């Protein structure tokens, strides 16, 4: 019963603090009984610490016995009744934790089975073209690839490689784009620790941008982030542009060009007057992408005039930091057709696993709080789109990225071995993982002399160099300031494990006698004004200080500036102290590098990046963050053994250059240089004639064949006599004819020589001169509804059409043949539209100027623009096998569920007929299966669930609009996109952005479970408060007219 009595003592403590509380909303004393729900977020409950100790430390049997004991001693007193209820509650919480752990164990087992199956299938497909001897050699190749990774990285870091690198890059003039969206980002006086979004990542990206801007061969670096102009936020975060001054005085005087250097570019998106936490930024990502695309296009043109000989200088790479910026970088990479790089910093699957292991929240509750499934899907997309994924440690690769469907270390090694041998990978792709530790600028650091000859209590013999103010702010806490200082610097976050550190210090009397403890845990004015999580940690620490009577031995100053941090390190080194990072998991640990640079030995968690850091620097000890004794013993060993302390200090100072920013940037740029160069494929156009007023709307397409769009398609012979709808059934002969024509289109588009372009004689499509373009992107169950809306919109703006200021685009999942039949059935002509986005965004057509010869013109450059990581034949074979496996689940006499539709398929869209959508796997399951096999694609259920289109991973209807902006200069804000209340599974991509969106009530797909099987809820990505979104009361002419009037299109056009 000893354990049982211990539990009861904790429950008694809960009752002791369970009286009155403070209402955070009113600031007044509350007499309401405190809630015992652990997942409650509204108020801090001081009992949470005790409850969690009980749940994690004791068996369910002990908890049950406590409840039985409380129930058996029932009395009329309120205290005993509450004790019984508390026992019951805690017992149930413990059981819930076990239940969640069991469910997650089943999920992990299923994930393992799926990965093994996918790996076997991928290996079998790739083994078909190897001989028996080659198959045996593949194993050796895999081992070589695995064992040689570190060797290759060392070679890149060698003196010889660095000299070669400098000679190679000094003549280059690269443009690099970095993206970091959340938090408050500025170049000077960073407010690190102000909130959970403004942490180490902010400092990392700013310093990376600054360091890259100082490197030979880099002309300009843009760090793109969010412009914040909100009350309570400094005005500097609302400045559109901020130049980052170089830390290198030699390079700062060297003027490379007018626009050279590193800059923070703030893009306005989301609510204009509100600071938005990262979990709530997802609906506004498309708006950022559109704004960033405009900036990059303009900057590429400016750089072209300075260093590109008049041709645009496109980014060498677009580098996203964290999941939200990675999602943006993927879309930008696809729109620009340039390489993408990604750094995760903190990964969603790893965080989800950690939260579920704690047992306090279910998967649904975690998702509701952190929008974790949207974050995970963004990280999976980053694996699909990235050329390189940069990590800080090998643990991040082997234990964290390995959790994702899109990355398999074993399969990655196989693919790398095949590429080295020149053997086909059958359409499979895996991003390259590059371990490049973050850097630090050490030129300005002078390590402290670690002696006590001078007085650090604020009384110096000479007043020539007064002590920093922060020293006195810390020293005032100590009764004996000459003892070595144990320093911890972190946000007040539970995962930083600061409470365990205080407990370890408080319970080890020898350590308390030898050292002081300093906690730099953010800034605060009033604990009640802090966030719930931060105040919870701080109050727990204060309680522990009081419990162990640590007054005079622990410092916890309320305020510090970023500029004070070096002085804090110096003070700890001067006292011959130790720096500690006791976090449960530390992805890297930049503060460990900083501390080592100032001559401090370190003690750090054995989980994550510190293992690599201490392995390189050899300047400290690793500890188990869950073991208080391990923490106390390591600190005591370094503080008490002066010989060991001196050795660790010297090793750190000797090896610290391996973590410098120049070293990091050299490795970084070497990886960028290894990427296959990509840029927009269309030919440069004559900018001088771009604004020519002599080109009329009628002749603007006359010579379009001269700009490599001369692939024409005539469908006159395919029209059905008297047919009124493309839904009419076609006999097999007509279907075969259409398939042959469309296949011929695709083959011809690949074989055309796009270099033969007479730039001096170019004309431009009429779409360039439109002031407002209506994009009909409705996904209707009945084609008559789509035709009716098209005719209604055309009739509303019909009077303004002759001015040439208004245009139309049809964006659909239909094939070109189906579009042609649709237009014919409604009495419409291709010339009524400026462009046709077909097959869910995998094809782009324009109307031909010579309708008698051919009604449509294919933009074959769009094919090459979206071709990135398209699996081709290897993907098609896998999809056919998948369809066969799905059909095995049908009834004995039932028709096949999914059938390959070759008549509707093209080179960049593999189509499947779906006979029963309710039996077909969700699109997310198909994406998961493809990712497990390293096949990158975008799967879309469309046409009321009767068709499945599989297209390139970075192709979509929304990306096609961005392509039109990039190629023809059509402003994205000029688009007005008409959608229904629901649509295909790519529906969400059409909603956000700088374009106007009109949602037509009563129009949409009737397949209600289209979006029920999504990876994340629609409300997590729906920009409900966007000023660019309008919803009509219906779909008649008056409803649509009212919406267009609110948008301002009709009013603006009438004023022309």
From Swiss-Prot:
SUPFAM superfamilies: UDP-Glycosyltransferase/glycogen phosphorylase (SSF53756). It is an enzyme of class 2 (transferase). The keyword Metal-binding does not apply. Its EC number is 2.4.1.14. The keyword Transferase applies. Keywords: Glycosyltransferase, Phosphoprotein, Transferase. GO terms for molecular function: sucrose-phosphate synthase activity. It catalyses: beta-D-fructose 6-phosphate + UDP-alpha-D-glucose = sucrose 6(F)-phosphate + UDP + H(+). The modification Phosphoserine is found at residues 158, 424. One of its GO terms (biological process) is sucrose biosynthetic process. Pathway: Glycan biosynthesis; sucrose biosynthesis; sucrose from D-fructose 6-phosphate and UDP-alpha-D-glucose: step 1/2. Residues 112-123 have a biased composition (Basic and acidic residues). Phosphorylated at Ser-158 and Ser-424. Activity is regulated by phosphorylation and moderated by concentration of metabolites and light. Residues 112-132, 681-700 are annotated as: Disordered. Homodimer or homotetramer. Plays a role in photosynthetic sucrose synthesis by catalyzing the rate-limiting step of sucrose biosynthesis from UDP-glucose and fructose- 6-phosphate. Involved in the regulation of carbon partitioning in the leaves of plants. May regulate the synthesis of sucrose and therefore play a major role as a limiting factor in the export of photoassimilates out of the leaf. Plays a role for sucrose availability that is essential for plant growth and fiber elongation. Belongs to the glycosyltransferase 1 family. This is Sucrose-phosphate synthase. It comes from Spinacia oleracea (Spinach).
């Amino acid at each position: 019963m000893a354990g049982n009595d211990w539990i009861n003592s904790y429950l008694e403590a809960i009752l002791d603090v369970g009286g009155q509380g403070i209402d955070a909303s009113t600031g007044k004393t509350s007499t309401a009984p405190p809630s015992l729900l652990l997942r409650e977020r509204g108020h801090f409950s001081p009992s949470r610490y005790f409850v969690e100790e009980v749940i994690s430390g004791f068996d369910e049997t002990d908890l049950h016995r406590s409840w039985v004991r409380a129930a058996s001693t029932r009395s009329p007193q309120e205290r005993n009744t509450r004790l019984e209820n508390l026992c019951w509650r805690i017992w149930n919480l413990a059981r819930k934790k076990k239940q969640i752990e069991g469910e997650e164990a089943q999920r992990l087992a299923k994930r393992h089975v799926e990965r093994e199956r996918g790996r076997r299938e991928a290996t079998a497909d790739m083994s078909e073209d190897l001989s028996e001897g080659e198959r045996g050699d593949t194993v050796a190749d895999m081992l070589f690839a695995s064992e040689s990774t570190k060797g290759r990285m060392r070679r890149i870091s060698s003196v010889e490689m660095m000299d070669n690198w400098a000679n190679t890059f000094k003549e280059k003039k690269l443009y690099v784009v970095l993206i970091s969206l959340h938090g408050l980002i500025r170049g000077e006086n960073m407010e690190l620790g102000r909130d959970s979004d403004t942490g180490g990542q902010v400092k990392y990206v700013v310093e990376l941008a600054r360091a890259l801007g100082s490197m030979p061969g880099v002309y300009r670096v843009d760090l793109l982030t969010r412009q914040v102009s909100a009350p309570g936020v400094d005005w500097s975060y609302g400045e559109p542009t901020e130049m980052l001054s170089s830390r290198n005085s030699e390079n700062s005087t060297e003027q490379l060009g007018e626009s050279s250097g590193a800059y923070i570019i703030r893009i306005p998106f989301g609510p204009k007057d509100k600071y938005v936490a990262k979990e709530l930024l997802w609906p506004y990502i498309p708006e950022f992408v559109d704004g960033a695309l405009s900036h990059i296009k303009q900057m590429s043109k400016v750089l072209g005039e300075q260093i590109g000989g008049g041709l645009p200088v496109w980014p060498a790479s677009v580098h996203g930091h964290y999941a939200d910026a990675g999602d943006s970088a993927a879309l930008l990479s696809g729109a620009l057709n340039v390489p993408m790089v990604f750094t995760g910093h903190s990964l969603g699957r790893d965080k989800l696993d950690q939260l579920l292991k704690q047992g306090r929240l279910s998967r649904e509750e975690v998702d509701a709080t952190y929008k974790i499934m949207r974050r995970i899907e963004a990280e999976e997309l980053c694996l699909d789109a990235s050329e390189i994924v940069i990590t800080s440690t090998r643990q991040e690769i082997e234990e964290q990225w390995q959790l994702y469907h899109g990355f398999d270390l074993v399969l990655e090694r196989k693919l790398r071995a095949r590429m080295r041998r020149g053997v086909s990978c059958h359409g499979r792709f895996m991003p390259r993982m590059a371990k490049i530790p973050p850097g630090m600028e050490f030129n300005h650091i002078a390590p402290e002399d670690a002696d006590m000859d001078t007085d650090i209590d604020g009384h110096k013999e000479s007043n020539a160099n007064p002590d920093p103010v922060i020293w006195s702010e810390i020293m005032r806490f100590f009764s004996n300031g000459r003892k070595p200082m144990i320093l911890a610097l972190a946000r007040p976050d539970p995962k930083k494990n600061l409470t365990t550190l205080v407990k370890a210090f408080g319970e080890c009397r020898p350590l308390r006698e030898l050292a002081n403890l300093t906690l730099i845990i953010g800034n605060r004015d009033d604990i009640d004004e802090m966030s719930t999580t931060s105040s919870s940690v701080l109050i727990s620490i204060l309680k522990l200080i009081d419990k162990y009577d640590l007054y005079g031995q622990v410092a916890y100053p309320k305020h510090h500036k970023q500029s004070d941090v070096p002085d804090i390190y110096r003070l700890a080194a001067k006292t011959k102290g130790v720096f500690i990072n006791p976090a449960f998991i530390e992805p890297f640990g930049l503060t460990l590098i900083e501390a080592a640079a100032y001559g401090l030995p370190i003690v750090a968690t054995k989980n994550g990046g510190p293992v690599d850091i201490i392995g390189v620097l050899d300047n400290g000890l690793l500890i188990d963050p869950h073991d208080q004794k391990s923490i106390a013993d390591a600190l005591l060993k370094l503080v008490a053994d002066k010989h060991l302390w001196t050795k660790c200090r010297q090793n750190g100072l000797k090896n610290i250059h391996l973590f410098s920013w120049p070293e990091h940037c050299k490795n970084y740029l070497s990886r960028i240089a290894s990427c296959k160069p990509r840029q927009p494929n269309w030919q440069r156009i004559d900018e001088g004639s771009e604004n020519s007023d002599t080109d009329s709307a009628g002749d603007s397409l006359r010579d379009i064949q001269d700009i490599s769009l001369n692939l024409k398609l005539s469908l006159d012979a395919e029209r059905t006599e008297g047919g009124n709808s493309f839904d009419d059934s076609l006999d097999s002969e007509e279907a075969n004819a259409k398939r042959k024509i469309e296949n011929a289109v695709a083959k011809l588009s690949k074989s055309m020589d796009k270099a033969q372009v007479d730039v001096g004689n170019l004309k431009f499509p009429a779409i360039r001169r439109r002031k407002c373009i209506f994009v009909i992107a409705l996904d209707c169950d009945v084609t008559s509804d789509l035709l009716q809306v098209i005719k209604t919109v055309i009739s509303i703006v019909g009077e303004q059409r002759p001015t040439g200021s208004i245009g139309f685009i049809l964006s659909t999942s239909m094939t070109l043949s189906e579009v042609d039949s649709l237009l014919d059935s409604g009495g419409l002509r291709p010339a009524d539209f400026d462009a046709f986005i077909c097959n869910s965004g995998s094809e782009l057509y324009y109307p031909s100027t010579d309708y008698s010869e051919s009604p449509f013109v294919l933009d074959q450059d769009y094919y090459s623009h979206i071709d990135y990581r398209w699996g081709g034949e290897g993907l098609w074979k896998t999809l056919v096998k998948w369809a066969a496996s799905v059909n095995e689940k049908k009834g004995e006499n039932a028709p096949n569920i999914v059938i390959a539709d070759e008549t509707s398929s093209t080179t960049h869209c593999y189509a499947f007929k779906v006979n029963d959508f309710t039996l077909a796997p969700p699109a997310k399951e198909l994406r998961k299966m493809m990712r497990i096999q390293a096949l990158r694609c975008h799967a879309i259920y469309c046409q009321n669930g009767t068709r499945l289109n599989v297209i390139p991973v970075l192709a979509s209807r929304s990306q096609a609009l961005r392509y039109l902006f990039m190629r023809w200069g059509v402003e994205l804000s000029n688009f007005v996109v008409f959608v229904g209340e629901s649509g295909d599974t790519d529906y969400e991509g059409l909603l956000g952005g700088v374009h106007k969106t009109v949602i037509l009530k009563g129009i949409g797909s009737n397949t209600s479970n289209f979006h029920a099987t999504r990876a994340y809820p629609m409300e997590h990505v729906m920009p409900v408060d966007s000023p660019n979104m309008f919803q009509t009361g219906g779909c008649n002419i008056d409803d649509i007219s009212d919406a267009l009037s609110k948008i301002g299109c009709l009013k603006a056009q009438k004023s022309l």
